Amino acid sequence: MSYTFAPRFNDGRSTAREDFHEPLPVCLHTHPRHTDPEYDARMHKGAHDNLWVITAISNPVRYKTRYSLYRKFKHHITQELKLNLITVECSFGKRDHQLTADLDDDNAKLHVLKNGVKTIDIRVKNTSQVWLKENLWNIGLRAIPLDCEYVLFADADVHFTHPHFATELINSLQEYRVVQPFETACDLGPNGQVIGVHRSFGYCHANGWEWRPKPNNEGGYHVEKSKDRQGPSGFGIPFHPGFAMAFRREVLDKMQLLEVGVLGAGDHHMCTALIGRVKLSMPGKIHANYKKECLRWEKRAAEIVNGSFGYVVGTILHDFHGAKKNRKYVSRWEIILENEFDPETDVYKNCYGVLELEMDKKPKLRDAIMTYFKARHEDSIEVE
């Protein structure tokens, strides 16, 4: 049986040109919902077989919410969405792994659930506290099977609400090489109430909205409005870079995720690099080698992704784990700047491939990072 799909663009095109620059109306970027059961079944089978989700757990402060939210996330991915899942858990020092306790330290184990979904648990260790998410996601890539065609990296505290999420994700990855798998994101409070709404970076970019951060020394987190003072249609704070990102496998075969952000901001760097503006995602006084790593990733992305960066329709829910003011998204840059963090000499990779801090070289940097992680107060239920 063959299917004919109506063009989704007003000039008769059925796909987006990679050199397309003028903004498109939001409605033209909305993927249609197909109701043919054979189509849905075929796309769902493709998602089940060819799409893998990778997440990571690193919890040196031993926050309880990290584990409870992960278990909720795992149930959502494997039981509700019925997608394959790779979890990379990094334990600190000689502590036991909390989620993959049945494995040897240097081993990975494949589990096949009753519904046919596969999960892979990977155990690694480190002895210093740095931001590891992108680093652990890259380690998870080593475990994906050869027939995997699409990879979704996701924080272990989100919930995808679209009823046909996997189908829509794969459809979007036919059009774009990289996507943020949501249009809007809702931050939830401790009682499940919505306390904030965001629009994804991919959504804003795909709809022609220009990211224009104010010149400052705070990492490019403040965005100016355009000349007409209008933002993307709808509501929500624009250009959110976080929560999740999905790639075609062919992209990840040529480039992996950027690991330079030892206090976070890796997602921010990568989203801005995908649109060729990574210089504006970091303070101007950042160490030259930090800037060099980001620019190198941007150059590689320009060659491989070539601006093909979009989004998936739908909303994700972001579970509460402490007030966002404690993340200090802007002021944490002071730790990096004051200690002149150099990614070429201040960190190394251990035998597991996990980033370690050269702790004795810069003890002030070591102590400041430890203080930062403790000050996040992720088990607190205070919203403000």
Predicted regions located by residue number:
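Active-site-proximal specificity loops/subdomain of glycosyltransferases
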Residues: 89-148
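C-terminal catalytic/acceptor-binding lobe
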Residues: 2-49, 59-69, 73, 261-384
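Short beta-strand-to-loop acidic/aromatic patch adjacent to the donor-nucleotide binding site
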Residues: 148-161
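Short glycine/serine/threonine-enriched helix-capping/active-site loop
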Residues: 88, 179-184, 312, 319
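Conserved catalytic core of nucleotide-sugar-dependent glycosyltransferases
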Residues: 159-277, 292, 297
